[in-house]
Amino acid sequence: MEPREVKDRILENISLSVKKLQSYFAACEDETPAIRNHDKVLQRLCEHLDHALLYGLQDLSSGYWVLVVHFTRREAIRQIEVLQHVATNLGRSRAWLYLALNENSLESYLRLFQENLGLLQKYYVRNALVCSHDHLTLFLTLVSGLEFIRFDLDLDAPYLDLAPYMPDYYKPQYLLDFEDRLPSSVHGSDSLSLNSFNSVTSTNLEWDDSAIAPSSEDGDLTDTISGPRSTASDLTSSKTSTKSPTQRHNPFNEEQAETASSDTTPVHTTSQEKEEAQAPDQPDACTELEVIRVTKKKKIGKKKKTKLDEDASPLHPTSSQQKCGQQGEGDGLVGTPGLARDPSDTVLASPQEQGEGLSSTAGSSELSELSQMGLLIPEMKDTSMECLGQPLSKVIDKLHGQLDPSTWCSHADPPEQSFRAGSPGEAPEKPPFCDFSEGLPAPMDFYRFTVESPSTVAPGGGHHDPPGPSQPLHVPGSPAAALQEEEEGGRGEGQTSQPVEDRQGEEIQEPEPQEPDSQLPLVSQEPLVSQEPVPEPVSQPEPGTHEALCKLKRDQPSPCLSSAEDSGVEEGQGSPSEMTHPSEFRVDNNHLLLLMIHVFRENEEQLFKMIRMSTGHMEGNLQLLYVLLTDCYVYLLRKGATEKPYLVEEAVSYNELDYVSVGLDQQTVKLVCTNRRKQFLLDTADVALAELFLASLKSAMIKGCREPPYPSILTDATMEKLALAKFVAQESKCEASAVTVHFYGLVHWEDPMEEALGPVPCQCSPAEGTITKEGMLHYKASTSYLGKEHWKACFVVLSNGILYQYPDRTDVIPLLSVNMGGEQCGGCRRSNTTDRPHAFQVILADRPCLELSADSEAEMADWMQHLCQAVSKGVIPQGIAPSPCIPCCLVITEDRLFTCHEDCQTSFFRSLGTARLADITAISTELGKEYCVLEFSQDSPQLLQPWVIYLSCTSELDRFLTALSSGWKAIYQVDLPHKAIHEASIKQKFEDALSLIHSAWQRSDSLCRGRASRDPWC
């Protein structure tokens, strides 16, 4: 979606929210109660106002608080800064929004925005909503409609750090919602006129609600005053749900979305409730209630839903008795609106389920009583949001740990409890006919989005299922196989798994049997319950030093940077045991908002996984790549410019995928589109990562928009094997048919030819006192209250990798000193947000950027070049400079070891180095590290320097050591000698080279370089 369309959609949503509020207040005049935090009408308004102010911010983590403090009076700033439950600037931004609504001053603040566009450009990108004159003018006009709306909002709310509104599970149970507090006159026959703007057309606009984030509202029809509801669209959605496992709208199947507005039948729940309460015996009321087609929505998963209701109903005896009593008296809904909205009430079965054998000629009183129960159960909610994707409120529920497994089997809280806890087995405010696989996913890490619930049982899955045609033999055939082996290891083959109705949070809908080629190829068993990747099974070595060493290595965590470090989230905030792989990237709310704004193509598109991979490894041109899996697309992301932090290199629709090809030893994965027009080769360099990606991809397609049959997964790698055998045969001077490859992997290889030239002096350590660059520059000293910048002259010196800023050339004490090569600095970039030309920023980790300005473009370019060189050189540690490490392929045959580059287009191999296995005398490793040193015999005709090989993780190193030891033992009939690295200087050199490999990988996408606590996308 184009930025202009996004901004138009945001303003359209604000308009709908303001109109709804105005309709209430216009009808009630002076009797209208004030809007409070827990009211649903506030939820959508604040969500869209917050989106408008966040859209285009340069630093989302700080929110718009850094801007609005320039316009806000001091006592209000102090009032917000001392809030005890608001800890972040993003939360303070929303507290300021609440304060502006309370004071009816939001329009005045926006006028200040309009008068200070220069100040806005410092904090927003150029295409931000508030930086567009037309959009800001319309925004101001819409907000002026809130002038006479009364708000009574509490600013000190802990959820403001995560969301602009109160999550459903946080709402007090004993407080009435805004619609329930309205005077009784509003609930009369004029309800249609009050909501006349909310016609079928406007409802269709509202489901396509937000281009930034899924709507947090379950539907306007949940309210006491209701808009029309489309029965035809309900039937369409029920038909769709029998084909798709998730009842998710498929944007690629346009046939399902065509429903004429003339086919819809509006049914207003308010008029039904009032007529039934006033005259329950009238035939008209019964006739109107009979038209409600609840049974057609209930046919999905009917039998299992009944069982769940029977099991769950004893958990709520109080609410059930109260409800039965009310139904017997014939009054109910209007008298107790709070009970009618309690999600615990939805566990009662519908009349069609309880009385299937009832005659159609039953008495009118009995039918009225049953029909009233039918009204209570479905709550007549607008399910369009549920068919499209999870609302943002469900994401907030997950982040707060509301779906913790410890609460799944707990009893419901007593009615007098002040805060609502999620009832077991369903999400808050979720209608009983929704897909429970969306409502209760697995417990997840902090800000982590997953697809598969670890307790979900696939149809027909088991320990002894044969693998499908697209599965490796060592991959289990059931999504729950790994967890069952961990938790139910003693269960026999004949025993059945836990019943579906006893498992809270499992799919209630009966899934269709899938074709054999649609079975999900899952990761190996260990990654589901352990953070450590596990290599594929190979032959066990003889007992000895190598086996013990490998066992110890498996216990060590991978030294790769964890995803928590990538996202700026501390490792302690998530459970490491639930991490499937260190390369999985945890997405927090700020990242998710950025992805929704800049990447996602569909409204309500859901993020499944974000995985860190690479491209070009086998060719020696390693580049970082992020693979983003949603329910519609596979996005391949690269580093972007400053205003757009990342670039969408490709967006591949699941419907475009023809097949997936796995490379040799699962080191690469190739996505091939229909007609083979587009192909994308992704590097994994890790068996466990390849299996994780394949499992995630297949899960995303099954739960997303792709309909069966699913793309085949080819694991034979026939063409790659033939090309590699041909290359090895040429190098070994033998026939291709005689070649046997025991190992193929993507590694970093320290070229011994570079080492043979002698130690290279570290170029990052110039002689003491050497001046790299110095000169007079201007720096931004301060910014006035109205945004006017104040620049001062300074003398800047870059010496020994440290940047010094002095007030004048003659001064001795610097104003500031920055170590360009350490964690203190994150690089430099041009500055487009200042008033001065030729300005650039030095990015600092612990303080705002240092903004400098040169006199000319050439001088600025020279300074930036020197600063970038100082940063890149500073990454290389002091001391012995490590030799360049070449990304390449490593091949082990029966008698030789090869390093080579492979052209992925032509499958042409270029040899980098060759060694005979018989010439290897020993191998040296360090415990818990993924590198090794191969030592060669000095008596061999080919004199070789030691080879240093760096692999992606310890599991890949174990796989390499196993293959190497087996080949060496086949020659000498004894185990290959293993040694430990003891010399401190050599050990430090290898550590430095390893850190250089990792930092070079991160620098390619500007990640984690000196700013672990900052937003990695900035």
UniProtKB/Swiss-Prot annotation:
<feature type="modified residue" description="Phosphoserine">
    <location>
        <position position="423"/>
    </location>
</feature>
<keyword id="KW-0007">Acetylation</keyword>
<feature type="domain" description="PH">
    <location>
        <begin position="770"/>
        <end position="872"/>
    </location>
</feature>
<dbReference type="GO" id="GO:0005764">
    <property type="term" value="C:lysosome"/>
</dbReference>
<keyword id="KW-0963">Cytoplasm</keyword>
<dbReference type="Pfam" id="PF02759">
    <property type="entry name" value="RUN"/>
</dbReference>
<feature type="region of interest" description="Disordered">
    <location>
        <begin position="526"/>
        <end position="545"/>
    </location>
</feature>
<keyword id="KW-0472">Membrane</keyword>
<feature type="region of interest" description="Disordered">
    <location>
        <begin position="210"/>
        <end position="367"/>
    </location>
</feature>
<dbReference type="GO" id="GO:0044754">
    <property type="term" value="C:autolysosome"/>
</dbReference>
<dbReference type="InterPro" id="IPR001849">
    <property type="entry name" value="PH_domain"/>
</dbReference>
<keyword id="KW-0597">Phosphoprotein</keyword>
<feature type="compositionally biased region" description="Polar residues">
    <location>
        <begin position="258"/>
        <end position="270"/>
    </location>
</feature>
<feature type="modified residue" description="N-acetylmethionine">
    <location>
        <position position="1"/>
    </location>
</feature>
<feature type="region of interest" description="Disordered">
    <location>
        <begin position="555"/>
        <end position="583"/>
    </location>
</feature>
<feature type="compositionally biased region" description="Basic residues">
    <location>
        <begin position="294"/>
        <end position="306"/>
    </location>
</feature>
<keyword id="KW-0458">Lysosome</keyword>
<dbReference type="GO" id="GO:0005765">
    <property type="term" value="C:lysosomal membrane"/>
</dbReference>
<dbReference type="Pfam" id="PF23142">
    <property type="entry name" value="PH_PLEKHM2"/>
</dbReference>
<feature type="compositionally biased region" description="Polar residues">
    <location>
        <begin position="316"/>
        <end position="325"/>
    </location>
</feature>
<dbReference type="GO" id="GO:0061909">
    <property type="term" value="P:autophagosome-lysosome fusion"/>
</dbReference>
<dbReference type="InterPro" id="IPR037213">
    <property type="entry name" value="Run_dom_sf"/>
</dbReference>
<feature type="compositionally biased region" description="Low complexity">
    <location>
        <begin position="230"/>
        <end position="245"/>
    </location>
</feature>
<dbReference type="GO" id="GO:0042267">
    <property type="term" value="P:natural killer cell mediated cytotoxicity"/>
</dbReference>
<dbReference type="InterPro" id="IPR004012">
    <property type="entry name" value="Run_dom"/>
</dbReference>
<dbReference type="Pfam" id="PF00169">
    <property type="entry name" value="PH"/>
</dbReference>
<comment type="subunit">
    <text>Interacts with KLC2 (via TPR repeats). Interacts with KIF5B. Interacts with BORCS5. Interacts (via RUN domain) with ARL8B (GTP-bound form); PLEKHM1 and PLEKHM2 compete for interaction with ARL8B. Interacts with ARL8A.</text>
</comment>
<feature type="compositionally biased region" description="Polar residues">
    <location>
        <begin position="347"/>
        <end position="367"/>
    </location>
</feature>
<dbReference type="InterPro" id="IPR047327">
    <property type="entry name" value="RUN_PLEKHM2"/>
</dbReference>
<dbReference type="InterPro" id="IPR011993">
    <property type="entry name" value="PH-like_dom_sf"/>
</dbReference>
<protein>
    <recommendedName>
        <fullName>Pleckstrin homology domain-containing family M member 2</fullName>
    </recommendedName>
</protein>
<comment type="function">
    <text>Plays a role in lysosomes movement and localization at the cell periphery acting as an effector of ARL8B. Required for ARL8B to exert its effects on lysosome location, recruits kinesin-1 to lysosomes and hence direct their movement toward microtubule plus ends. Binding to ARL8B provides a link from lysosomal membranes to plus-end-directed motility. Critical factor involved in NK cell-mediated cytotoxicity. Drives the polarization of cytolytic granules and microtubule-organizing centers (MTOCs) toward the immune synapse between effector NK lymphocytes and target cells.</text>
</comment>
<dbReference type="GO" id="GO:0032418">
    <property type="term" value="P:lysosome localization"/>
</dbReference>
<feature type="region of interest" description="Disordered">
    <location>
        <begin position="407"/>
        <end position="440"/>
    </location>
</feature>
<dbReference type="GO" id="GO:1902774">
    <property type="term" value="P:late endosome to lysosome transport"/>
</dbReference>
<feature type="region of interest" description="Interaction with KIF5B">
    <location>
        <begin position="1"/>
        <end position="289"/>
    </location>
</feature>
<feature type="region of interest" description="Disordered">
    <location>
        <begin position="452"/>
        <end position="520"/>
    </location>
</feature>
<dbReference type="InterPro" id="IPR053015">
    <property type="entry name" value="PH_domain-containing_M2"/>
</dbReference>
<feature type="domain" description="RUN">
    <location>
        <begin position="36"/>
        <end position="158"/>
    </location>
</feature>
